[in-house]
From Swiss-Prot:
Keyword Hydrolase among record annotations: no
Pfam families documented for this protein: tRNA-synt_1c (PF00749), tRNA-synt_1c_C (PF03950), tRNA-synt_1c_C2 (PF20974)
Homology family: Belongs to the class-I aminoacyl-tRNA synthetase family.
Transmembrane segments: none
Species this chain originates from: Rhodopirellula baltica (strain DSM 10527 / NCIMB 13988 / SH1)
Subunit structure: Monomer.
NCBIfam families recorded: glnS (TIGR00440), PRK14703.1 (NF011291)
Record-given protein name: Glutamine--tRNA ligase
Motif ('HIGH' region): 76-86
Keyword set includes Cell division: no
Length: 601
């Protein structure tokens, strides 16, 4: 029976632990509410690509003496779960620090208490550690609220910031457009003394939400809209998850981000490409405060086929019950991929494989799927499972005889050893592996044909049993005792090999065959009147009862295996002592590629 208790060890768990040391062994993580795995040692991407443009820029800055070391950070906002796109940033920032003997901080940009929660703080830390990284320092932007406020007063005193009474809607109207300059706020020319008085009144809670803002005084005619007197502070009488009710004004992201980098002595602030036009503002704040000035470098964010990455859309999927939660195995979240059975090694390898680019592009999800196939092919033990069974009876098998067959655990790894599988006169095979009348190139079992049973014997089909509707319910075969795998003396050659389980000894399990959540490459490119939800794949989950070999009866949560000839599977946390549940990670081959190829013909 399945054991969800991670302190217990099954045969498969023992197998996995013998294959990996503590840093790489990964029992599948819990559903969001159970203990996280132990932090692993600092890890680096599995592949070492040639130097990308960010590495070249860092090398140049170090050579010129602009900086004397590498200090990076991963700065998520704790308002949701991380997804595969964040994994790219994590691998990049932590990987650069590791490769170059530097440091990498984990900093939570917790400047918006309306959307943030400690649940996300905890889950993000778990995800970073699960990927194999450990931060040098853990920080929160809220740790710097006092210093940020002091610097705001400094800019006010210097005449470089002012308190504005415009509403949010009026502020947008005054900002202008990409083709039209903005207009100065009617409050832009207040004296520094008056602005300081108003700012302190804002801090003291004397105004309502949205009544006033603090804005930087830069240039309302700038071609860069981000420099048109950006808001630095807004009023929000909302308790903060760390500071409580101490503050009723909160810094905007652009104001908090660069200054937090500066306080932590970050040297390279690596951001995704959408922040490229924010870089002049990042620089303006550092220069006008006269503080340590990190270099901001942007790279292309990860976009992937058959996937949506928008936090808003992912939230919609959860809220409208299109998925079971943030950790649904069809979601691109790290908690979802983790529950699906993806390994941290495969995700790091994927991030290294796709590289770092300056321009946005879309990566084929096949590359992510292939990364986990490649990793699990080398480490996952093989087991036999029949998902859609039909009975196969060996008519010349001695009655009551059970023979133990020796089966290799992993042909890619000799040290993985072998196991014993019971073989009897009544077996289950896959329904699709038999045809009463088969096409010419059907090399599996057919009436009048022969096939090898993996790790067993060659069998010859001589008849079938049908029900009242004419459906085949049983396949009748004889076996050739001279053809036992590993001891074959018959000299017979057959073209097909199929898997099987002994009917008497098979264990019943639940299998969840997960597939891609969307049926089109780009769900965001919806029709004029439609929505990305119109492209949901109705067949993204199929649940069935399967029959598996006895070795899987003791499978524990997190055990990953290859169901021979079918795909890679992992034991789901929903498993109980009475029911083992296997999630399909990926099939052995890219079935979508075949479907698309047929569609193009």
């Amino acid at each position: 029976m399945a054991r969800a208790n991670r302190g217990e060890h099954s045969t498969l768990s023992t197998f996995w632990q013998s294959r990996h040391n503590a840093a790489s062994f990964d029992p599948l993580y819990r559903r969001i509410d159970v203990n996280a795995p132990e932090p692993s040692d600092s890890a680096t991407p599995e592949k070492t690509p040639s130097k990308h443009f960010i590495r070249q820029a860092i090398d140049a800055d170090l050579a010129s003496g602009r900086f004397d070391g590498v200090a990076t950070r991963f700065p998520p906002e704790p308002n949701g779960y991380l997804h595969i796109g964040h994994a790219k940033s994590i691998c990049l920032n932590f990987g650069l620090a590791k490769d170059m003997g530097g440091t990498c901080n984990l900093r939570f940009d917790d400047t918006n208490p309306i959307k943030e929660d400690t649940e996300y703080v905890d889950s993000i830390q778990e995800d970073v550690r699960w990927l194999g990284f450990e931060w040098d320092n853990l920080h929160f932007a809220s740790d710097y609220f006092d210093q940020l406020y002091d610097w705001a007063e400094q800019l006010v005193k210097d005449g470089k910031a002012y308190v504005c009474d415009l509403t949010a809607e009026e502020t947008r109207e005054y900002r202008g457009t990409l083709t039209e300059p903005g207009k100065n706020s009617p409050h832009r020319d207040r004296t520094p003394e008056k602005n300081l008085e108003l700012l302190r009144a804002m801090k003291a809670g004397k105004f309502k939400d949205g009544e006033k803002t603090l804005r930087a005084k830069i240039d309302m005619a700038s071609p860069n809209i981000n420099l048109r007197d950006p808001v630095m502070y807004r009023i929000a009488h909302v308790p903060h998850h760390r500071t409580g009710d101490k503050w009723c004004i909160y810094p905007m992201y652009d104001w908090a981000h660069g200054q937090s980098d500066s306080l932590e002595k970050i040297t390279f602030s690596i951001c995704t490409l959408e922040f490229e036009h924010h870089r002049p503002l990042y620089n303006w704040y550092c220069e006008n405060l006269g503080i340590h000035h990190p270099r901001q470098i942007e790279f292309a964010r990860l976009n992937m086929t058959f996937t949506v990455m928008s936090k808003r859309k992912l939230l919609q999927l959860v809220k409208e019950n299109h998925v079971t939660g943030w950790d649904d195995p069809r979601m691109p979240t790290l908690v979802g991929l983790r529950r699906r059975g993806y390994t941290p090694e495969s995700i790091r390898s994927f991030c290294a494989d796709i590289g770092v680019a300056k321009f946005n592009s879309t990566i084929d999800v096949i590359r992510l799927e292939n990364s986990v196939r490649e990793h699990l092919n080398s480490v996952a033990p093989r087991r036999m499972a029949v998902l859609d069974p039909i009975k196969l009876t060996i008519t010349n098998w001695p009655e009551g005889k059970v023979e133990m067959m020796n089966a290799i655990n992993n042909p890619e790894d000799e040290s993985a050893g072998s196991r014993e599988i019971p073989f009897s006169g009544e077996l289950y095979i896959e329904t699709e592996d038999f045809r009463e009348e088969a096409p010419r190139k059907f090399f599996r079992l057919k009436k009048g044909g022969s096939v090898r049973l993996r790790s067993g014997y060659i069998v010859d089909c001589h008849d079938v049993v049908k029900d009242a509707d004419g459906n085949v319910t049983e396949v009748l075969c004889t076996y050739d005792p001279e053809t036992k795998s590993g001891e074959d003396t018959s000299g017979r050659k057959v073209k097909g090999t199929i898997h099987w389980v002994s009917r008497e000894h098979a264990q019943k399990v639940t299998v969840r065959n997960y597939d891609r959540l969307f049926k089109v490459e780009n769900p965001d490119a919806s029709s004029d009147t439609g929505s990305f939800l119109d492209h949901l794949n109705p067949d993204s989950l199929t649940t069935l009862t399967a029959h598996v070999e006895p070795a899987l009866a003791e499978a524990a949560v997190g055990d990953r295996v290859q169901f021979e000839r079918l795909g890679y599977y992992v034991v789901d946390p929903d498993s109980t002592d009475g029911e083992i549940i296997f999630n399909r990670i990926v099939p052995l081959r890219d079935t979508w590629g075949k479907i698309e190829a047929k569609g193009k013909k």
